[in-house]
């Protein structure tokens, strides 16, 4: 293996077109991200067909910009990595087909990467992962607790039984007429409100690491409906604070309990909701109180980007795991499928 391993990574699982060049799994030479937020804002959420069209329009120039920014050519690249899933199938296929074309044209290995594994390895771009550890995954489509005993070993110990946390944020945001994307808007308002409303904290069975947010979401919607029926004032800041406190309490408490139960002193957080200031602050407090080392990526690495895909791909490359040119996208994939068996 070369002393320096350069991986060109492509991420198109949802509404960001991103291409990155990663050196040795932890050094970002370039990380270009084209966001589609403005295009989807008027619809109040991501429209799959619109997302796919934007990926088609932007993928070629994004690849070129990533190579130019890294000051390298395709001949310098050791492997091509791409998100295989989970995600929007149409969006995924744009990135996968681009990656397959490059792999064929330049005779490079093709590495399929699980999107959530990428989110986890965003942490590795800023601080080396040490094992064992617990990962709290919080995003629009996933809420999970994962135990890792080594690189690319994923054991799910808890997951949502209904809504993902990011999905709950977006639905509550729409209920109080906040613009898309709703999660950051609630987080911003929550800094100025009061914990006025007694929204439920759903703990489920004793010692369970699973999550449930549908009841909380329904409670918020019903409360707002009742207030409006009575022509009472709805203080958006108070709704945001009360809702966020409920979510953060459950996420942080279960994450800390998992660390204690599995006897690990390292907690990492992954996914778009990891940029939430309320969650970051609460986890920092609890980890300090319990002597647990906490790692959360910078906000720019919490949201979808190709650098995280390149970071995870490095360990597949080291293990000799590649895909054939008939690689297809998968809209649903369990994170445990991404485990490298040693």
UniProtKB/Swiss-Prot annotation:
Fe cation binds at residues 115, 119, 304. Disulfide bonds: none annotated. InterPro entries: ATPase_NBD, Gcp-like_dom, KAE1/TsaD, Peptidase_M22_CS, TsaD. It catalyses: L-threonylcarbamoyladenylate + adenosine(37) in tRNA = N(6)-L-threonylcarbamoyladenosine(37) in tRNA + AMP + H(+). GO terms for cellular component: cytoplasm. Binds 1 Fe(2+) ion per subunit. It is an enzyme of class 2 (transferase). Pfam families: TsaD. It is found in: Cytoplasm. One of its GO terms (molecular function) is iron ion binding. One of its GO terms (biological process) is tRNA threonylcarbamoyladenosine modification. Belongs to the KAE1 / TsaD family. Required for the formation of a threonylcarbamoyl group on adenosine at position 37 (t(6)A37) in tRNAs that read codons beginning with adenine. Is involved in the transfer of the threonylcarbamoyl moiety of threonylcarbamoyl-AMP (TC-AMP) to the N6 group of A37, together with TsaE and TsaB. TsaD likely plays a direct catalytic role in this reaction. HAMAP family: TsaD. This is tRNA N6-adenosine threonylcarbamoyltransferase. The gene is tsaD.
């Amino acid at each position: 293996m070369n002393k320096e391993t350069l991986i060109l990574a492509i991420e198109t699982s949802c509404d960001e077109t991103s291409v990155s060049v990663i050196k040795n799994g932890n050094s970002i030479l370039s990380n270009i991200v084209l966001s589609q937020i403005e295009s989807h804002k008027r619809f109040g959420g991501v429209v799959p067909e619109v997302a796919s069209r934007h990926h088609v329009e932007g993928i070629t120039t994004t690849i070129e910009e990533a190579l130019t920014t890294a000051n390298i050519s395709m001949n310098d690249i050791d492997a091509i990595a791409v998100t295989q899933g989970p995600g929007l199938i149409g969006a995924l296929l744009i990135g996968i087909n681009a990656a397959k074309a490059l792999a064929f044209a330049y005779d490079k290995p093709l590495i399929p990467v699980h999107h959530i594994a990428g989110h986890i390895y965003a942490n590795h771009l800023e601080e080396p992962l040490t094992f064992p550890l617990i990962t709290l995954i919080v995003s629009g489509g996933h809420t999970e607790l994962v135990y890792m005993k080594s690189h690319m070993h994923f054991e799910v110990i808890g997951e949502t039984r209904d809504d993902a946390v990011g999905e709950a944020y977006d639905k509550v945001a729409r209920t109080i007429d906040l613009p898309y994307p709703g999660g950051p808007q609630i987080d911003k308002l929550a800094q100025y409100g009061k914990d006025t409303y007694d929204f439920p904290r759903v703990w489920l069975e004793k010692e369970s690491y699973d999550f449930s947010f549908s009841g909380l979401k329904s409670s918020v919607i019903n409360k707002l409906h009742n207030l409006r029926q009575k022509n009472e004032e709805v203080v958006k800041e108070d709704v945001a604070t009360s809702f966020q406190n409920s979510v953060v309490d459950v996420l942080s408490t279960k994450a800390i309990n998992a660390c204690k139960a599995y006897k690990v002193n390292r907690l990492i957080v992954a996914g778009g909701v990891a940029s939430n200031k309320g969650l970051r602050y609460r986890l920092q407090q609890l980890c300090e109180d319990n002597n647990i080392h906490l790692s959360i990526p910078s906000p720019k690495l919490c949201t979808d980007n190709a650098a995280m895909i390149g970071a995870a791909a490095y360990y597949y490359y080291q293990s000799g795991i590649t895909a054939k040119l008939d690689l297809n996208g998968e809209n649903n994939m369990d994170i445990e499928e991404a485990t490298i068996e040693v």
